[in-house]
Amino acid sequence: MIGRHKHCIALEDFSREEILEVIDLAASMKEVLQRPIKKVPSLRGKMVVNLFFEASTRTRSSFETAAKILSADALNWTSSSSSVTKGETLVDTAKNLEAMRPDVLVIRHSAGGAPRLVAEHVGCSVVSAGDGAHEHPSQGLLDCFTLREKLGTLEGKTVAIVGDVSHSRVARSDLHAFPKLGAKVRLCGPPTMMPAGVERLGATVHTDLREAVDGADAVIMLRIQHERIGDPLIPGTREYSKVWGLNAKKAADWLKPSCVILHPGPINRGVELSPEVADGPRSVILDQVQNGVAVRMAILYLLAGGAGEEARA
């Protein structure tokens, strides 16, 4: 359990204390990643099934790595090689996999709400690895962990989220999590890529990049979610990059010296971020990847029965 939760589906459901429970444990889990032998017996005998209906590099390999470091058995399942291609429904697929007695189902799906639907029909814990444009809770948690690690705290800090906010599940999870930890959130991007009603969550909305990043402690750059967009919402990527992309000159002129830059990946280099910025000293993008393993170790440990036992990490 994570606090009162059997599942990890949306950070909208999580309290400040529940978010801190995960990232505090992730700090301990990260220590395991620094060891010569990256293996602990915490989840020996447990099974984690990764159920991915969308392409993924970082998230799926991160969950698989997290499970294996904790000594759990990890099964990777993809829709292209399954009975889904023969017309099997999502719920039937999940029920059949649950019959194999996994402890955790990790699911990524193009439809918002798919993980919650699965959770209503299975008895094991369910973790959302991203559902449509709804949420990506483990990414939100690793962003919280990375920012706390780099900034010391999120309390009183300002985080700018820039790009295709409307179609970004990462932005939604971040937007639900950051204010609970005391951070102020600024959203910036084209008006056509800005969701309605975000002000009720405490965020301010900007269309001018310079204004949005002025004085910010961290900037999270988002790619354009072409796979979720029907009609074009911007004139073109070149024009987008000129207005909302972050290059070395803008970073040097507009960002304060201590500001760090994050990106959930994959990066469209030369569009939202120039290579010089993505690979520069402000970038903590690869730290996010490493922290993602630690955070997912914490999630699996708490949901698969590690809570209440002696953590042997």
UniProtKB/Swiss-Prot annotation:
Pathway it works in: Pyrimidine metabolism; UMP biosynthesis via de novo pathway; (S)-dihydroorotate from bicarbonate: step 2/3
Binding site for carbamoyl phosphate: R58, T59, R108, H136, Q139, G265, P266
Reactions this protein catalyses: carbamoyl phosphate + L-aspartate = N-carbamoyl-L-aspartate + phosphate + H(+)
Entry keywords, A to Z: Pyrimidine biosynthesis, Transferase
Keyword set includes rRNA-binding: no
Gene Ontology cellular component terms for the protein in this record: cytosol
GO biological process terms held by the UniProt record: 'de novo' pyrimidine nucleobase biosynthetic process; 'de novo' UMP biosynthetic process; amino acid metabolic process
Any one Gene Ontology molecular-function term assigned to this protein's record: aspartate carbamoyltransferase activity
Enzyme Commission number(s) of this protein: 2.1.3.2
Transferase among keywords: yes
Binding-site list for L-aspartate: K86, R169, R223
Protein's job: Catalyzes the condensation of carbamoyl phosphate and aspartate to form carbamoyl aspartate and inorganic phosphate, the committed step in the de novo pyrimidine nucleotide biosynthesis pathway.
UniProt-listed PANTHER family: ASPARTATE CARBAMOYLTRANSFERASE, ORNITHINE CARBAMOYLTRANSFERASE, MITOCHONDRIAL
Family, similarity comment: Belongs to the aspartate/ornithine carbamoyltransferase superfamily. ATCase family.
Subunit structure: Heterododecamer (2C3:3R2) of six catalytic PyrB chains organized as two trimers (C3), and six regulatory PyrI chains organized as three dimers (R2).
Protein name, per record: Aspartate carbamoyltransferase catalytic subunit
